[in-house]
Design a protein with these regions (language model features):
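Long, low-complexity, compositionally biased intrinsically disordered regions
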Residues: 1-167
C-alpha cells in the first residue's frame, strides 16, 4: 500500500472489476441514490444524468440541460440499466444491492437481477432536481483527471483536517 494511501483518512476502494468509461463515465453511490452520467447512444455530444433512489427505486433520467429522457416513461430506460450494470462493475453487486436495499431472493445478485427486482416493485418516476449537482461533480471529476500527478495538497481540499504528516 503506498504511503499516501496509508496516511489518508479515507481508503481508496479499488473497482470490483475494470470497466470501460465510454458508455458510463461517472458512477457514484451518494445522497441516497445510485447516480451517474451515461453517454447517449446516438449523439456523442449528449449525456444523460440518471439516478435510482435507495429503497423506493424512484428513478430519474434527463439530459445534462434537463430535458427528460424519452425512454424513461413508467419504467427504467436503457441509460438507467447501463448505470446499474456499470455500478455493479465499479462497486460489486453485493455493495450496490445493499446500498439500494434491493434483496435478490433467488441467489447471488448481478445487474440483471437487480434491475428485475427494482422494476418488479413498479417504482415511480423521481425528481430530476439532482441532475445539476451530479453533472457538476462529474465535471469536477474530469478536471481532477487533467491535473498533473503531484503530492501537493489541492487547494479546494484544504478544509479537511490534517491527520498526520505525509512521509
Amino acid at each position: 500500500m503506498p504511503v499516501w494511501e496509508r496516511s489518508s483518512t479515507a481508503r481508496v476502494v479499488p473497482p470490483a472489476r475494470p470497466r470501460k468509461l465510454a458508455k458510463v463515465p461517472f458512477v457514484e453511490l451518494a445522497d441516497g441514490r445510485l447516480q451517474g452520467v451515461v453517454s447517449s447512444g446516438s449523439d456523442a455530444g449528449r449525456v444523460y444524468v440518471s439516478s435510482i433512489a435507495t429503497a423506493t427505486y424512484a428513478f430519474a433520467c434527463s439530459t445534462n440541460n434537463n430535458r427528460p429522457c424519452g425512454g424513461a416513461r413508467g419504467t427504467f430506460c436503457n441509460h438507467i440499466r447501463a448505470l446499474v450494470g456499470e455500478a455493479v462493475l465499479q462497486y460489486g453487486a453485493e455493495r450496490v444491492a445493499r446500498y439500494l436495499k434491493a434483496d435478490t431472493p433467488d441467489g447471488e445478485p448481478d445487474a440483471p437481477r437487480l434491475v428485475s427486482v427494482m422494476t418488479a416493485a413498479r417504482p415511480e418516476q423521481g425528481d430530476t432536481s439532482a441532475a445539476a449537482p451530479v453533472f457538476s461533480r462529474f465535471l469536477r471529476h474530469l478536471a481532477y483527471l487533467e491535473l498533473e500527478p503531484t503530492t501537493a495538497p489541492l487547494p479546494e481540499m484544504q478544509w479537511f483536517p490534517p491527520t498526520r504528516t505525509v512521509a
